């Protein structure tokens, strides 16, 4: 078992409520939701932070928007809308060092987020 909880969910060593998966991405409901809809979208490849993206990740990241759009559709938040967040490193609020996107919806979002 890996020390990365997201890698363990990807490998199915730990259960996660899977919302979507393809050959590059896996999405699952957050166990500590900050909104009625809170999905974590993670690349299957272990990339620690946004700062660790390299040229060879273009294809994965290029598909990210399409995947987010599919998940918003699955969760019925495309309309009226949703928020997407990527935290990077400690000051950015990142707790799990496996790049991931938060999709939040199901309520009115406020600004600034905090």
Where are these predicted regions, by residue range?
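HIT superfamily nucleotide-processing domains
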Residues: 1-114
């Amino acid at each position: 078992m890996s020390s990365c909880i997201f890698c363990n969910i990807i490998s199915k060593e730990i259960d996660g409520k899977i919302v979507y998966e393809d050959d590059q991405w896996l999405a699952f409901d957050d166990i500590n939701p900050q909104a009625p809809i809170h999905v974590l979208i993670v690349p299957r490849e272990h990339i620690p932070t946004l700062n660790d993206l390299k040229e060879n990740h273009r294809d994965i990241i290029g598909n990210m928007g399409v995947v987010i759009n599919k998940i918003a559709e699955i969760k019925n938040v495309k309309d009226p809308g949703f928020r997407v967040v990527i935290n990077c490193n400690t000051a950015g609020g990142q707790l799990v060092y496996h790049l991931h996107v938060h999709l939040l919806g199901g309520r009115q979002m406020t600004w600034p987020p905090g």
